[in-house]
């Protein structure tokens, strides 16, 4: 198999934080579905994480570690709805999730992230559906089910119901 490493921004946001490895940025480690991710700061830490069966996570917004590690595969799972700089020359195989990428031009393959029949479909030519700007319809609600903060800032945990339940 392949060793997996994650690069992340310094202040990641996730809609479902307990289902995101990005929490390792804040907590040092994160576990999702039995996969343990550990924040690392050096190549030695990276090797230690791999030897422990963990996924190492670098805080690396510029992607410098991609050039240093020379991976066999790069997967852009930022879900920014646009390409923030991922290129086919970053690795022998490049994959991107969601809109903003064209398979064969920007990356080798694009994976559809829009709800519906094509969710998860891999495109080797062409692109995922464009971003509609409207959240998916769940129970008849779209934009109404998304809460937007009135200002920038950090929201500290008061209570974590997911951890209380175990």
Predicted regions and their residues:
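Well-ordered secondary-structure scaffolds
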Residues: 1-166
């Amino acid at each position: 198999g392949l060793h997996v490493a994650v690069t992340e921004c310094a202040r990641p946001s996730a809609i479902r934080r307990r289902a995101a490895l990005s929490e390792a940025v804040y907590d040092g480690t994160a576990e999702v579905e039995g996969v343990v991710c550990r924040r690392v700061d050096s190549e030695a830490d990276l090797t230690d994480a791999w030897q422990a069966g963990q996924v190492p996570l670098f805080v690396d917004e510029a992607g410098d570690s991609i050039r240093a590690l020379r991976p066999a595969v790069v997967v852009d799972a930022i879900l920014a709805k646009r390409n923030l700089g991922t290129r086919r020359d970053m690795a022998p195989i490049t994959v991107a999730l969601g809109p903003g990428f064209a398979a064969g031009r920007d990356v080798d393959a694009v994976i559809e992230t829009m709800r519906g029949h094509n969710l998860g479909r891999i495109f080797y030519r062409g692109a995922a559906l464009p971003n509609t700007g409207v959240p998916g319809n769940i129970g008849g609600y779209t934009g109404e089910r998304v809460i937007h903060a009135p200002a920038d800032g950090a929201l500290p945990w008061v209570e974590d119901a997911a951890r209380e339940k175990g």
